[in-house]
Amino acid sequence: MHEHLKEKLAILPDQPGCYLMKDRQGTVIYVGKAKVLKNRVRSYFTGSHDGKTLRLVGEIVDFEYIVTSSNLEALILELNLIKKHDPKYNIQLKDDKTYPFIKITAEKQPRLLITRNVKKDKGKYFGPYPNAQSAHETKKLLDRMYPLRKCSNMPDKVCLYYHMGQCLAPCVKEVTEEQNKEIVDEIIKFLNGGHKEVRSELETKMYEASEKLEFERAKELRDQIAHIDAIMEKQKMIMSDLVDRDVFGYAVDKGWMCVQVFFVRKGKLIERDVSMFPIYDEPEEGFLTFIGQFYENSSHFKPKEIVVPGSIDSELVERFLEVEATQPKRGKKKDLVELANKNAKIALEEKFYLIERDEERTIKAVENLGKQLGIETPYRIEAFDNSNIQGTNPVSAMIAFIDGKPAKKEYRKYKIKTVQGPDDYESMREVVRRRYTRALKEGLPLPDLIIIDGGKGHLAAASDVLENELGLYIPMAGLVKDDKHKTSHLIIGDPPEPVMLERNSQEFYLLQRVQDEVHRFAITFHRQLHGKSVIQSALDDIPGIGDKRKKVLLKHFGSLKKMKEASIEEFVEAGMPKNVAETIYTYLTDKKTL
């Protein structure tokens, strides 16, 4: 641990507040809150942690904290700091999941619509519905029962809906505000849980029509009753008080938290939301952060009541969200919380089971690959690929897969130093020589299998260096691509012989992942270098710009395009003196062809 960290830990206050963990670049990588800052922040640097938390702690080189006057203030501040800094280790709920609502527009001649965007436009919104089908079925029923306007624009003549008795034709007839209000009130009553009353009224009208021998009308009313029954059958009542509430439950296992939310609307359980994320705080703290972000999401509306598990501070939730929050001790609400907790626990168990199965399949693929190639199981695979464009900025990349999974800390990038022009074979010789000379010198682990992204020439060049120069005899295979630049097969041996793998086998998928990953890593590195060289060459002729300032500009702007779009003030912000900023601006503005 850094000495300055020890000094800062020693003077932490025993008050509530927020803390910001920073990496060596000074970037905020995690924001947390605590009832007692001293205890919480120190806990990161003492005791044992799971691997995920160890990764976080391993990146921390500094921290700062903000003392607050209460836990509520700390919770509010934490959410604002997360939004401001977007730390990579914090959960960030996305606004990508929306639910459909039925809307009665506030137009002079109102309409019924399905929408996923709730606006402050004086319209009346009902929902959310669990899915689009449920919303459309309900709207279809309401369209049959209540003759509101259907057309988005007023036509010049009556449409089919008028002839079907489903519209009053405000396009050609006068429909008063009172008539519309009466219809809208009926729709609101239905959507607010009054469907039983509406059904009873329709039933009475049906019998009256039958007695008057109006059989067509009676049949129409009977069909409407049947539609109501069909829709309501799908939305069984679980609470008799018709209160809109969200019921929360959660579970924690192996450093992960799952939160399940049951949406209860008008007494019916209509939908649930499942969120799963890594957790670095105490479960209760993680849950409070989650619920704060949950209701900041534009698709989640605060109901009349929020129901939380017994371990959560419901008073804090209530003050923070300004909604009634309860912790039921018995009854149906307690049953729902326990059901949400149970579902969260099951979801986590499924997650870890699937991870375990995936690991089993991956290990099996590694073992089978060894058998197919006639070698020992290649638990460690290293793969190489070259990248250049017409010989410029030639680079190579090496990636490592351990137990069938990418080991990104083992990846290495190489600028080609000894080869002039686009010579793939000599580039492969150089990079293999550099990699394994260093491995021997530093006692680094050697791979069980080396994969060269290329054909016989690449394989021969790499094998020659490995065996004849370094005296290493490590199994080596070439990955051959087809005409579409996709993984085709392996070649191995001397002379190289093709090894055909079944395309739907796990070992083939493993090779595809290796090839795609090494290609991605190499080409990304090449593009970075190419971008830097373009910027640096573009800046070569500007007076007052040396290597140091080139690096500063490259780091600040990232691309020549952004530099050409920048103002003089932005160059000053990047650390350039005013006169140099003016020179750069003038030069780049004049050089339109750059």
UniProtKB/Swiss-Prot annotation:
The keyword DNA damage applies. Residues 14-91 form the GIY-YIG domain. It comes from the Bacteria. GO terms for cellular component: cytoplasm; excinuclease repair complex. InterPro entries: GIY-YIG_endonuc, GIY-YIG_endonuc_sf, GIY-YIG_UvrC_Cho, RuvA_2-like, UVR_dom, UVR_dom_sf, UvrABC_protein_C, UvrC. It is found in: Cytoplasm. GO terms for molecular function: DNA binding; excinuclease ABC activity. Its main location: cytoplasm. Keywords: Cytoplasm, DNA damage, DNA excision, DNA repair, Excision nuclease, SOS response. The keyword Transferase does not apply. The UvrABC repair system catalyzes the recognition and processing of DNA lesions. UvrC both incises the 5' and 3' sides of the lesion. The N-terminal half is responsible for the 3' incision and the C-terminal half is responsible for the 5' incision. NCBIfam families: PRK00558.1-5 (NF001824), uvrC (TIGR00194). Interacts with UvrB in an incision complex. Belongs to the UvrC family. This is UvrABC system protein C. It comes from Bacillus anthracis.
